[in-house]
């Protein structure tokens, strides 16, 4: 391993450690029961699969929790794809387990800022999810 690669590894470890320290208060204050971490999910109904970061109770409500990093603060309007992804995980979780996780929580570690936390209800994002899946299949079918 050359010096630049080793230095990069050290930087990444420090960055991960700093992110965890930044997120710790949010996690400690809001998350109670954890149902799963890095949960592999799939849906025959949707025809998609993925791996969910965390399924836990957030402020007492079973929730799909996705962790993101960003160099700058993002507005809710700019992260609709994150909510659609969370809606997919929520549907997959319910299909696989029979348990509902109606909320989608995006916890974003932002460089040099406090973490951003967005909480949305799954049902607000299912239409976008279905449209995204349909668009993906259409593009794939026509080779775009």
Sequence positions of predicted segments:
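Mg2+/Mn2+-dependent nuclease catalytic core
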Residues: 39-142
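A short acidic/basic microdomain associated with nuclease active sites
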Residues: 12-44
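Glycine- and charge-rich intrinsically disordered segments
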Residues: 4, 25, 144
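Short loop/turn motifs at secondary-structure junctions
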Residues: 6, 33, 100-101
